[in-house]
């Protein structure tokens, strides 16, 4: 059946300002599904220096109207004239704030650059990982030289605003076992200042971090929902199934409860961290 073969399926009404380009059947998707290429953000994130690609992207709206972005594995460095990557580093996480607007100057990269002065020298526009895991073994000397931890690292979870500060979850990852790479083994709760404006020393300054917040192997908080009932609902997946937890209050540091099933399949909330099977 043709992609638009059913006359009952109507094309979505897309605002032209969104600058989306329809991708009909590009991936062989179900014909009722409409997929678009985001030309606006393709243009915004087309780079020649600095950050030029990353995964694990999260955004959080901030009270001042800015948007906080976090990335996991990223590329920082030089892009050649033919759009291929030149010399790039591979920080395992990075952060940025977007001020209102869709121009390059609206992207404020909160990165620790190795050097930005000499394009002919090593590590030009390369950066260090934003937040390191305390078990990472590289020496300070190697970190200052621009090397990146590969053994223990943090990957981003979601973030929320509480008491005019930003709370963010960072998932601890163990890469030391070649037979069990990217093993989740805990969560860090980090708190950032929102005092001032982008570019100020106080803005998005890391105020505190609890690297031992929990030892969860499930990534609760990969996605969050701040509900009107006063809880934050924390979502993750396990074996292609959804697992859910929630906070007691809007503070991520408050007591967590987990939505688990009993042997009869009835779900309820419990403060006891569940087994993977119970969480599913």
Where are the predicted features?
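Hydrophobic core register within WD40 beta-propeller blades
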Residues: 59, 159, 222-224
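Beta-rich carbohydrate-recognition and catalytic domains
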Residues: 3-52, 61-152, 161-214, 228-231, ...
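Beta-rich catalytic cores
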Residues: 53-55, 153-155, 218-220
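Long, low-complexity, proline- and polar/charged-enriched segments
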Residues: 217-228
């Amino acid at each position: 059946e043709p992609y638009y073969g059913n006359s009952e399926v109507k094309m979505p009404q897309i605002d032209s300002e969104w600058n989306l380009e329809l991708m009909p059947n590009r991936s062989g998707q179900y014909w009722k599904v409409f997929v678009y290429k985001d030309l606006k953000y393709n243009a915004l994130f087309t780079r020649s220096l600095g950050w030029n690609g990353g995964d694990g992207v999260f955004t959080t709206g901030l009270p001042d109207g800015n948007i906080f972005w976090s990335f996991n594995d990223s590329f920082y460095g030089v892009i050649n004239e033919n759009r291929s990557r030149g010399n790039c580093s591979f920080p395992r996480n990075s952060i940025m704030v977007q001020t209102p607007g869709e121009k390059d100057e609206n992207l404020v990269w909160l990165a620790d650059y190795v050097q930005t002065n000499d394009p002919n020298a090593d590590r030009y526009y390369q950066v260090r990982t934003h937040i390191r895991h305390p078990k990472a073994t590289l020496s300070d000397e190697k970190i200052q030289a621009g090397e990146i931890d590969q053994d223990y690292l943090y990957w981003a979870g979601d973030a929320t605003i509480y008491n005019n500060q930003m709370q963010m979850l960072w998932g601890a990852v163990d890469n030391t076992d070649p037979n069990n790479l990217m093993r989740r083994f805990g969560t860090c709760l980090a708190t950032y200042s929102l005092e001032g404006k982008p570019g100020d020393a106080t803005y998005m300054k890391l105020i505190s971090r609890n690297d031992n917040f929990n030892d969860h192997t499930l990534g609760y908080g990969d996605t969050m929902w701040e509900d009107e009932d006063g809880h934050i609902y924390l979502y993750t997946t396990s074996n292609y199934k959804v697992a859910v937890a929630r906070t007691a209050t809007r503070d991520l540091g408050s007591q967590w409860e987990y939505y688990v099933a009993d042997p009869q399949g009835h779900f309820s909330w419990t403060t006891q961290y569940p087994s993977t099977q119970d969480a599913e």
